[in-house]
Every structure is written in C-alpha cells, then in structure tokens.
UniProtKB/Swiss-Prot annotation:
Family: Belongs to the class-I aminoacyl-tRNA synthetase family. Glutamate--tRNA ligase type 1 subfamily.
Catalyses which reaction(s): tRNA(Glu) + L-glutamate + ATP = L-glutamyl-tRNA(Glu) + AMP + diphosphate
Cellular component terms per the entry's GO annotation: cytosol
Enzyme Commission numbers on file: 6.1.1.17
Enzyme superclass (EC): ligase
Protein name: Glutamate--tRNA ligase
Example GO BP: glutamyl-tRNA aminoacylation
Amino acid sequence: MTQQQVRTRFAPSPTGFIHLGNIRSALYPWAFARANDGVFILRIEDTDLERSTQASVDVILEGMSWLQLDHDEGPYYQMQRMERYKEVLAQLQAAGHVYPCYMSVEELDALRERQMAAKEKPRYDGTWRPEPGKVLPPVPEGVKPVLRFKTPQGGVVGWDDKCKGRIEFQNSELDDLVIARPDGTPTYNFCVCVDDMDMRITHVIRGDDHVNNTPRQIHIFEALGATVPVFAHLPTVLNEQGEKMSKRNGAKAVTQYRDEGYLPDAMVNYLARLGWSHGDDEIFSRAQFLEWFNLDHLGRSAGQFDEAKLRWVNAQHLKAMEDAQLAALVRPFVVQAGVPETQLDADDRLPRICALFKDRCETLVDLARWARVFYVDAIEPDADDFAKHVTETAAPALDAFAAAMETVAWNKDAINAAIKDVLKQLGLKMPQLAMPVRVLTMGTAHTPSVDAVLELLGREKILARLKSR
C-alpha cells in the first residue's frame, strides 16, 4: 500500500499583525511537510468580515517570506469558497446531519440564565432537534433559522494527539453546534472541516486553544465521510511576563524582528526550540532542523519567550555566517545608518569589516553601527572613553603615531611595526597608545586588534580623525 503524502496547512485569520506565537504555528507544519517530502498549504480564514483586512494578509505573507516558510499551495481564501461550503451544507442537511433551529437570541439567553441558576453548564437544549416521535414547536413566521449540527448523543469522541497524548470528550458534554447563520453563511468549525477535507490535509498542527474545537470537527469529518486528520495541539507561547503572547500584551510583529536585524535562520532556530527539542542541541541550521524534525519530540508545556536568549541565538548564527553572505544582509542596514550605496560600492571592505566585527555583534543593526564608522567622515567619540584616554599625556604619542601613519606602507604588518616603533621610541606600553588611537579613530576604546581596524579604516580617515582632537 502506498503511503499517503503528508499535507499540512497554516490557516491564520487576517485580523492584525502576526507575532512569534502565531508564526510558530506556521513553522512546525511547514517543517513537518518539508521533512516528509510533503505539501504545505497556506489558507487565509477571512470570514470575519469586520476585522479581516488585506493589509493583515500582506503582513502575514511578508513575515512568512522573510522567514522563508514557503508554501506549495495557496493562499486559499475562505471567502472565495462560500459556494462550496453551501453545497456541502446542503449535502449534510439532505443526509439528516443538520437541522434548522428557530430559537431566538432572547430565548437562548433565557435558557442560559435558567441553566446557570440551576448550576448547570449553559448549553443548547435541543428544542428544535428532530427525533423519532418528537413533536417540534410550530415554526414562527418571518424568522430565518440557524442550522445546527446533530451531535451524537452517547459515547465519547477522542483522538491521540501527537503533542498532548490521548484526549477524550463525552458527547453528552457537547451541544448541537451552529454551523450556518440565519443569512446562510457557514461558521468557522464547519468551514475548517470542508477545507481540510477538500485540501486532503493529513496533519493539523496548531495551537492548543483549538483543543475544544477538535471533538466538534471530528464529528463533522465523520458526517462528511472524510478521513480525520492527525492532530497535534501545540502549547501556548508565553511572553516574558508569563502571559499568553498577544498583541494586547505587547507582542511585536514578526517583521519588527527583521527590522531589528535578526537573521531568518536564527529566528527559525529559536522558534523551533520554543516547543520542540533534539537532545541538548541549542544551535542548528535550517537544514539540520528539517533533518531532525518530527512530531514525537514536541513539548507539552508552554514555551516562554526570552529576548536575551533570542539575541544570543542570533549572535551564534552571525558568527557562523560566511562573510560575503553577511555583508549582503547587513548592507541595507548600513545604508539605513547613513552610508550612501556609492560608498559601499567603491571598494570591497564590507565583507572584511563583517569578518572583523561579527564576533562582537548580536544583530545586523549592531554590525551596521560598526560598519558605518568606516565610511562616514566624522564620528563622535564616547565622552567617557575620550576623557579617560585622550589626555595631554597621550598627545606626544598620538603626534608620533600620526607622523608614522603618513608614510607607512599600507598593510596590517607594516602598521603593527609602526605602532611598535612609536612605543619603543617613547618607552610606552601598548594600551598607552592603542587606547587613545581607538577612541579617536573608532569612537570607542573597545575594538578588535588595532592594526586590523586601522588597515580597514584607511590612511586618510585615520589622519583626519587623529587631527580632530
């Protein structure tokens, strides 16, 4: 028997920006499809007409594109599938799985109040549910009914969740779900089932806020004669305060992390570890993640976001990246920091600057700040470093060093030899010269090897900055 091809989906609602908690629900189904030579589908659940916007769709697509979570099919839009939903609804109604309910909102509210007063769980009581021998109330004039799904009344509904283990619900706990509104538009749980059936979804990997929807969806799948997919309900992502990550609680849009200089592969690495593990491995490439990923090592407890940890993960990926590749990624940030493209194109220094400074940086923004210093005309040295190191005592050494820089052959070894000559002539130790030189030429006393920095900075800029004191 041929094994069924894995087909997964990410089905966001376009009602706002997409944050890290949302995007993790895209990462895992994407990774599972890629790891199994499967198909990853993007579906936009845009039936909330009041809140759904095209701008939100664009933000979802932009965030997924940045993280390179490419989809094989879609995006499909639920609003474009309304005729299909109504067709399937008619089939269910013809098969006796659906019935019209004429109970008004006022009647439902009164029922709920009576149940709560009796300390019962509020639920629809089946007034309009047709049963053999049951006499239904007279149909009220001018009232458009909702359509309800006939939930099985006995036994249990359950599934083996790939994240949470066995989950079961008593059917007696579930009332008859509204699956179409009075105007005929179908509701969320019904649309999802039709989509998953039509798109042949094999694995539904989503947040655990959907656990309570799942028994209802299983009943609908079974009524449709569809194969019930495998479910994996991911634990919540918490923010740094331990609350559920959400826009209201200050979560940032995924694209903001892009603008702050995080690398897509570092974000994938960090998000992967927020609910899945491969032994003690903390840092891994996208290719390694896809090689290792399966549903057997999903965590059961909530993952808590930690921005300091994210920065650390990003720093590891920065250090490991090829210099030319890193230069291409940091370039727009250097331009944003005020360096014209023409200056960057004038020489090949940017990859070498990246090589020299990437170990000191956590983000592309950090790296761009260092790179900027090599291209701009004037810099503003750190005031504390200037006061500490650029003193009258340092002046003779700086003058001698400036004179040496005017004639030295321009390579790292020659610059190093010139520094040592000045130290020897004046009887100084390296920090007595290197520190003020760093402050004047780079703006800070804390840089990599001074000869390597000076070689990249160039004779003209060094002399101009030494004279500016």
